[in-house]
């Protein structure tokens, strides 16, 4: 007769946890030390006679990282494909046993065209009708916000939708209304014990299939909190979605399959693609970058069950777990300031902190709007970088509960911007022109190799244009990251609603300072090289390499820009005129 294994005692579990923490800290410090030493020492692994074409230990480390990341992403795609074949063999989902799901949509001053696409796609989701609820919460209850409520009522007209305009929200002060008829000093008065608006919202959400609530403005986190709190424990899973997102009909079903297959998975995200890639060169490059971010970087994380961020446009959470950390998630503070951005990343971190896995599936897909102007894109990236640095610190507390890859990748990605900035400044101020050009060639070469792998994985030649994103990172995103680092405790939506686009010029300041630093260093280096003696054999070889390298760099840009203008701008119809909003 088999005997049950004894459960470990509380002391044993505590010791095991402390040991894992200690080993994780040692591993993180080891990675940090090796990277810093490899960068600072500049150990060359291969070099030509004059040291002009050199390949160092740090470059080898980054190359190995990219190869490993690509390999694990490929293996994860194969794993997802195998799971899809198993699901297909099981047949369609049984409506009687399907998990109940609530689709929550966060809306704020949305472009009516995008909002209509979002709501229409929500209607078209291929999921058992009786097991799916739709809840949209509008951040704002003024007259100019109610067009979103009207559109919800119009799109779901045949579903008997319920709409409610709430004067407050869950966290706005509420004054009980006195009962009428009680007059005179000391007279008996009856007051309402609870907010009638909250009670009405919760009653509608838990009894009606399609509900839209417009509440007092409070920010996106307030909107999401209302949806989660009002739902309570009435559903099994909660899907998050933004109002500018168009869902693929199979998006929800594929997410549900991931959670159904493994109870250890607490949340799963899908493939977010760009809805407006042809609006501008910024949105086009963003569309390529998005694909790699999800199908290479997050696919790699998913292989180790530790996706760092379930993206807001398309994610699914186990509701019983979400309700456990809902209050802590909403009340998050950083340096004494209440956090109002980085909602999706902190939701993911809360799930990881409980020891549950987070996954990504490329079979679930949606299309979301991205900024088409450089200024708005810069504001968006600054906001995302703020939440990244802040959540990096929180995420570090739970590295020991997950695979070592989570620790390794967090350290590498966290240090990377600082090493890039240090390299650029050192070359501009202390390096020779050829050294600067050699680094630029290496950067574009690595970017082209990564783009070529993405083109092969996706089966789309146009992905090679992703290599053009490298200069955008170096010149725009890198200084924005440092602005984000020093302004992490400043809260807000970060980007404006799409109905009324507002320019934010604050992120331009670090770009201007960065440009002045680089121009100053370049002028200094050019002046020094102009006075140098170029008659020696090493200098002659450097001049030859400089001419050949400059020719290769210019040729690369000519080819890539030609592909972009001919293959993208001229052969694809571009949406012009920005947003045409009619309410």
UniProtKB/Swiss-Prot annotation:
<dbReference type="GO" id="GO:0050501">
    <property type="term" value="F:hyaluronan synthase activity"/>
</dbReference>
<dbReference type="GO" id="GO:0044849">
    <property type="term" value="P:estrous cycle"/>
</dbReference>
<dbReference type="InterPro" id="IPR029044">
    <property type="entry name" value="Nucleotide-diphossugar_trans"/>
</dbReference>
<keyword id="KW-0328">Glycosyltransferase</keyword>
<feature type="topological domain" description="Cytoplasmic">
    <location>
        <begin position="457"/>
        <end position="462"/>
    </location>
</feature>
<comment type="function">
    <text>Catalyzes the addition of GlcNAc or GlcUA monosaccharides to the nascent hyaluronan polymer. Therefore, it is essential to hyaluronan synthesis a major component of most extracellular matrices that has a structural role in tissues architectures and regulates cell adhesion, migration and differentiation. This is one of the isozymes catalyzing that reaction. Also able to catalyze the synthesis of chito-oligosaccharide depending on the substrate.</text>
</comment>
<feature type="transmembrane region" description="Helical; Name=4">
    <location>
        <begin position="436"/>
        <end position="456"/>
    </location>
</feature>
<feature type="topological domain" description="Cytoplasmic">
    <location>
        <begin position="73"/>
        <end position="404"/>
    </location>
</feature>
<keyword id="KW-1133">Transmembrane helix</keyword>
<keyword id="KW-0808">Transferase</keyword>
<feature type="glycosylation site" description="N-linked (GlcNAc...) asparagine">
    <location>
        <position position="489"/>
    </location>
</feature>
<protein>
    <recommendedName>
        <fullName>Hyaluronan synthase 1</fullName>
        <ecNumber>2.4.1.212</ecNumber>
    </recommendedName>
</protein>
<feature type="transmembrane region" description="Helical; Name=5">
    <location>
        <begin position="463"/>
        <end position="483"/>
    </location>
</feature>
<comment type="similarity">
    <text>Belongs to the NodC/HAS family.</text>
</comment>
<dbReference type="Pfam" id="PF13641">
    <property type="entry name" value="Glyco_tranf_2_3"/>
</dbReference>
<dbReference type="GO" id="GO:0005886">
    <property type="term" value="C:plasma membrane"/>
</dbReference>
<keyword id="KW-0325">Glycoprotein</keyword>
<feature type="topological domain" description="Extracellular">
    <location>
        <begin position="46"/>
        <end position="51"/>
    </location>
</feature>
<feature type="topological domain" description="Extracellular">
    <location>
        <begin position="567"/>
        <end position="583"/>
    </location>
</feature>
<keyword id="KW-0812">Transmembrane</keyword>
<comment type="pathway">
    <text>Glycan biosynthesis; hyaluronan biosynthesis.</text>
</comment>
<feature type="topological domain" description="Cytoplasmic">
    <location>
        <begin position="1"/>
        <end position="24"/>
    </location>
</feature>
<dbReference type="GO" id="GO:0016020">
    <property type="term" value="C:membrane"/>
</dbReference>
<feature type="transmembrane region" description="Helical; Name=6">
    <location>
        <begin position="502"/>
        <end position="522"/>
    </location>
</feature>
<feature type="transmembrane region" description="Helical; Name=3">
    <location>
        <begin position="405"/>
        <end position="425"/>
    </location>
</feature>
<feature type="topological domain" description="Extracellular">
    <location>
        <begin position="426"/>
        <end position="435"/>
    </location>
</feature>
<dbReference type="GO" id="GO:0000271">
    <property type="term" value="P:polysaccharide biosynthetic process"/>
</dbReference>
<keyword id="KW-0472">Membrane</keyword>
<dbReference type="GO" id="GO:0030213">
    <property type="term" value="P:hyaluronan biosynthetic process"/>
</dbReference>
<feature type="transmembrane region" description="Helical; Name=7">
    <location>
        <begin position="546"/>
        <end position="566"/>
    </location>
</feature>
<feature type="transmembrane region" description="Helical; Name=2">
    <location>
        <begin position="52"/>
        <end position="72"/>
    </location>
</feature>
<feature type="topological domain" description="Extracellular">
    <location>
        <begin position="484"/>
        <end position="501"/>
    </location>
</feature>
<dbReference type="GO" id="GO:0085029">
    <property type="term" value="P:extracellular matrix assembly"/>
</dbReference>
<feature type="transmembrane region" description="Helical; Name=1">
    <location>
        <begin position="25"/>
        <end position="45"/>
    </location>
</feature>
<feature type="topological domain" description="Cytoplasmic">
    <location>
        <begin position="523"/>
        <end position="545"/>
    </location>
</feature>
<dbReference type="GO" id="GO:0005737">
    <property type="term" value="C:cytoplasm"/>
</dbReference>
């Amino acid at each position: 007769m088999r005997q049950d294994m004894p459960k470990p005692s509380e002391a044993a579990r505590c010791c095991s946890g402390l040991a894992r923490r200690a080993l994780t800290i040692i591993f993180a410090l080891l990675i940090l030390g090796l990277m810093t030493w490899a960068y600072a020492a500049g150990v060359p692994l291969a070099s030509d006679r004059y040291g002009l074409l050199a390949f160092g230990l740090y470059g080898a480390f980054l190359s190995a990282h990219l190869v490993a990341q690509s390999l694990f992403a490929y293996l994860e795609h194969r794993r997802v494909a195998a799971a899809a074949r198993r699901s297909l063999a099981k047949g369609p989902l049984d409506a009687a046993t399907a998990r109940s799901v609530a689709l929550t949509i966060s809306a704020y001053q949305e472009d009516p065209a995008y909002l209509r696409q979002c709501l229409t796609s929500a209607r078209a989701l291929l999921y058992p009708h009786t097991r799916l609820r739709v809840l949209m919460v509008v951040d704002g209850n003024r007259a100019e916000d109610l067009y979103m409520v009207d559109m919800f009522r119009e799109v779901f007209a045949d579903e008997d939708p319920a709409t409610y305009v709430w004067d407050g929200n869950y966290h706005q002060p509420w004054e009980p209304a006195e009962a009428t008829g009680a007059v005179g000093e000391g007279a008996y008065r009856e007051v309402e014990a609870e907010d009638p608006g909250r009670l009405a919202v919760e009653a509608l959400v838990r009894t009606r299939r399609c509900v839209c609530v417009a509440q007092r403005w409070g920010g996106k986190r307030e909107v999401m909190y209302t949806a989660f709190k009002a739902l309570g424990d009435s559903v099994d899973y909660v899907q998050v979605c933004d109002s500018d997102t168009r869902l693929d009909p199979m998006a929800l079903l594929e997410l549900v399959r991931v959670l159904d297959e493994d109870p250890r998975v607490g949340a799963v995200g899908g493939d977010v693609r760009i809805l407006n890639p042809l609006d501008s060169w910024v949105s086009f490059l963003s569309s390529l970058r998005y694909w790699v971010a999800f199908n290479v970087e997050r696919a790699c994380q998913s292989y180790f069950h530790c996706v760092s961020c379930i993206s807001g446009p398309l994610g699914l959470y186990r509701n019983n777990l979400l309700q456990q950390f809902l209050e802590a998630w909403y009340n998050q503070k950083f340096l004494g300031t209440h956090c109002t951005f980085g909602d999706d990343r902190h939701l993911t971190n809360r799930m990881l902190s409980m020891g549950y896995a987070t996954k990504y599936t490329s079979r679930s897909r949606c299309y979301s709007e991205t900024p088409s102007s450089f200024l708005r894109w810069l504001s968006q990236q600054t906001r995302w970088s703020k939440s990244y640095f802040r959540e990096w610190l929180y995420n570090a507390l739970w590295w020991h509960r997950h695979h070592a890859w989570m620790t390794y990748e967090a350290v590498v990605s966290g240090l990377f911007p600082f090493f890039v900035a240090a390299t650029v400044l050192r070359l501009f101020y202390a390096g020779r022109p050829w050294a600067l050009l050699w680094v630029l060639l290496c950067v574009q070469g690595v970017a082209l190799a990564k783009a070529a792998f993405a083109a092969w994985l996706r089966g789309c030649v146009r992905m090679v244009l992703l290599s053009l994103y490298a200069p955008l990172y170096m010149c725009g995103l890198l200084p924005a990251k440092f602005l984000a680092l020093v302004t992490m405790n400043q809260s807000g939506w970060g980007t404006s609603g799409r109905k009324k686009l507002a320019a934010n010029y604050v992120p331009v300041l670090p770009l201007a300072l960065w440009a002045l630093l680089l121009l100053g260093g370049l002028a200094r280096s050019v002046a020094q090289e102009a006075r140098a003696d170029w008659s020696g054999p090493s200098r002659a070889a450097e001049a030859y390499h400089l001419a050949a390298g400059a020719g290769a760099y210019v040729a690369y840009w000519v080819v890539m820009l030609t592909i972009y203008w001919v293959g993208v701008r001229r052969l694809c119809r571009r949406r012009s005129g920005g947003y045409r909003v009619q309410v």
